[in-house]
């Protein structure tokens, strides 16, 4: 009964004002459901966020980092990883069912859901038709902590196979800094030039960091 009453206030607040009205602490408490011995769930949620700095830091951390937080065991760690994976799959479904990319913000949110927290550089491509509706997205190349080998011909081959007319390129920087490197700019130029021969248009190249991003299109580089 004690644990149920602890959740009563966040639940009532959600039902009355909507889920977006909850603070990060209240939202986390809603997912955790229970506290630990001598610590209610709201206190536990507050301590977890203070320890990891933010929801982002919490949801992208590894189990070893949880060992220093009293009351956090395998079960609660699994709950949190489940939340992160649920969000990632939600954006996957949303991309398929809301075929057009409705806005640059939606594109960025989708890419962040796919690439945030990866320990290696991943290069992915969103393939679009002539009306800029999403056909599919693919992770085409994976690399190391700070490098990924990208082959323009493989991108073009995939685009031709699915009859794509336009592309959005994306990759992550596991270091957290989204600022593109000289190599990032050079490979983007190579891909654009290669695509021009096949009448394929590159709309953007988005680099995902830790809580930040850089859009080549927004910078005026494409």
Swiss-Prot record:
Ligand binding (Zn(2+))? 171, 173, 184
From the record, which residues define motif JAMM motif? 171-184
Keywords from the UniProt entry = Hydrolase, Metal-binding, Metalloprotease, Protease, Zinc
A molecular-function term among this protein's GO annotations: metallopeptidase activity
* Boundaries of every MPN domain copy: 100-222
User: What's any GO biological process attached to this entry?
Assistant: proteolysis
Can the keyword Membrane be found in this entry's annotation?
no
InterPro entries registered for this protein in UniProt: MPN, RadC_JAB, RuvA_2-like, UPF0758, UPF0758_CS, UPF0758_N, UPF0758_YicR
Family annotation (SUPFAM superfamilies)? RuvA domain 2-like
What are the transmembrane regions?
A: none
Q: Note the Pfam families from the entry.
A: RadC, UPF0758_N
Identify its protein family. Answer: Belongs to the UPF0758 family. YicR subfamily.
HAMAP family, alphabetized: UPF0758_YicR (MF_00018)
Matching PANTHER family: DNA REPAIR PROTEIN RADC, UPF0758 PROTEIN YEES-RELATED
Provide the protein name. Answer: UPF0758 protein YicR
Originating species: Escherichia coli (strain K12)
Origin organism lineage: Bacteria, Pseudomonadati, Pseudomonadota, Gammaproteobacteria, Enterobacterales
Name of the coding gene: yicR
């Amino acid at each position: 009964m004690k644990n149920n009453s602890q959740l009563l206030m966040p639940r009532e607040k959600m039902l009355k004002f909507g889920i977006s009205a909850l603070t990060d602490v209240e939202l986390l408490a809603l997912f955790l459901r229970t506290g630990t011995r001598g610590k209610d769930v709201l206190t536990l949620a507050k301590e977890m966020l203070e320890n990891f700095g933010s929801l982002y830091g919490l949801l992208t951390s590894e189990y070893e980092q949880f060992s220093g937080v009293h009351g956090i065991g395998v079960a609660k760690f699994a709950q949190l990883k489940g939340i992160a994976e649920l969000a990632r799959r939600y954006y996957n479904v949303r991309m398929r069912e809301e075929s057009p990319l409705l806005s640059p913000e939606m594109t960025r949110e989708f890419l962040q859901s796919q690439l945030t927290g990866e320990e290696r550089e991943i290069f992915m491509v969103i393939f679009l038709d002539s009306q800029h509706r999403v056909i599919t997205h693919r992770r085409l190349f994976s690399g190391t902590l700070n490098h990924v080998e990208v082959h323009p011909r493989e991108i073009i081959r995939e685009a031709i196979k699915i009859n794509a007319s336009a592309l959005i390129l994306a990759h992550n920087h596991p270091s957290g800094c989204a600022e593109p490197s000289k190599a990032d700019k050079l490979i983007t130029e190579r891909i654009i030039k290669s695509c021009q021969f096949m009448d394929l248009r590159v709309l953007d190249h988005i680099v995902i960091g830790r809580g930040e991003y850089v859009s080549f299109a927004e910078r005026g580089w494409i």
